[in-house]
Amino acid sequence: MRKNTIDIITLGCSKNLVDSEKLMKQLEANGYKVTHDSDHPQGEIAVINTCGFIGDAKEESINMILEFCQAKEEGRLKKLYVMGCLSERYLKDLQMEIPQVDKFYGKFNWNELLADLGKAYHSEFAIERHLTTPKHYAYLKISEGCDRKCSYCAIPIITGKH
């Protein structure tokens, strides 16, 4: 376990990846060493950016959370934070069922994590990211949410209107 190191695990869509990259830039600006989707996480803190849209993605997110809860119980991790769509949609259920998580953040309030770590949000880096994709491309988040109300879709419930 490395001091001042945070492991960021991103699950789900490319919009989640953009959110993780923005968070990574903010954490680096606050002096943290950040790893992303490492096969061997070594940080003292982990942040899991979850997906809550389709069944398989929800299951993957919950399994990842439980895996890191076990690492925390074994003393390989000090703090565990969860953000993203899963915690946006199922916050109360997750808080009751997985108390090992130090705090859950929704899709839009992940910057509160900085305050909880005793760090500042750097507005000068508001649009900057720590890119995790190969140098020849990067994802661009154009919008968030959806105005449609399709009976089969949870996106407007999770992310709100466009």
Which residues are covered by each model-predicted region?
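Proteins enriched for Cys/Gly/acidic motifs involved in redox and nucleic-acid/cofactor modification
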Residues: M1-H162
